[in-house]
Amino acid sequence: ELFNIKRPILLAGMNVAAGPELAAEVTNNGGLGVIGGVGYTPKFLKAQLDELKSYLNDKNAPFGVDLLLPQVGGSARKTNKDYTGGTLPQLIDIIIESGAKLFVSAVGIPPKWAVDKLHGNGILCMNMIGAPKHAAKALAVGVDIICAQGTEGGGHTGQVATSVLIPMVVDSVRGKKSPLTGKQVPVIAAGGIFDGRGLAMALCLGADAVWVGTRFVAAEEAGAPPAHQKAVLRAGPHDTIRSTIYTGRPMRIIKNTYVVDAEENHAEEIKEFADRGIIYMQGDSRRRKEAGEEWSVQQQMEARPQLMGQASAAIDAVEPASKIMDEMIAGALATLRRGVGMAAKL
């Protein structure tokens, strides 16, 4: 109802993977496409949004933008940084001018001035959270929608499982109203959702829709490099890990030789760097350079982070986004029908 979409599926704003073509395809197929804008300049974000709109079948169809907005300074992690490079006001202006219907803030609460300005232009604001306590902080600045991501999810994520997190967040926001719509604040579920069963589960837990990332990394329209897609297809149930070595915040990625070595053999160094406000990979690279160590191209490739959730273990094919969404809806309907039949046995 909020976005006039037919399917309760939102594309996670995964930066390069969730590019203009994929975001438009999700919107064209009845969902809501969201592009990631980590590190984007205002000029580049505008170009990405212009490209996205060029792919839309309905030029008035909804889409969104996701930015990383961690708190910097004060009691925040010393490794936090301003991913916008001081250009958030300009980025907000670009988002407003583009006609976006949704703004998403991840890894932090958006500043109230930004929420107020977006509301003044009819744009809904959503906050990503990984723990129930974060919901109240987001609502305090006027956020309209809460997206709760369980630890199974790829990228920056918390420690609470989706099946536990969603009901707790649903309960915590019950009775809370969106400042923009005056209606109940919806909860979007994320983390480990890759097919219709996950969608059905999320709805049964009280969520209003799902935020899907890893499954769409393996979409034909995704901007993810082929190596990233192949890594998703190869991954097993135990092949991802949460680590702080790339951004200073816990982030779920595929295990590679570099991250495994860091976590198993350099835990003290990771902490020492973090205490000084240095991200481990940056500090380690500097140390190696000073020691005259040179990385081979292969070592550099292996050290690159490939973000993905635990759902990667259940994905075995790169398919069109439309097929992924069709199967997700069909699977959810089948699961919910089965649930109705099971209800008689309770």
Predicted regions and their residues:
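Conserved active-site-proximal phosphate/metal-binding subdomains
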Residues: Q159-P186, F194-L346
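Gly/Ser-rich catalytic serine loop of serine hydrolases
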Residues: N15, G155, A189-R197
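Short, structured patches in soluble enzyme cores that scaffold and shape functional sites
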Residues: V107, G150, A189-G191, T214-F216
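Active-site entrance/lid segments in N-terminal catalytic domains of soluble metabolic enzymes
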Residues: E1-L180
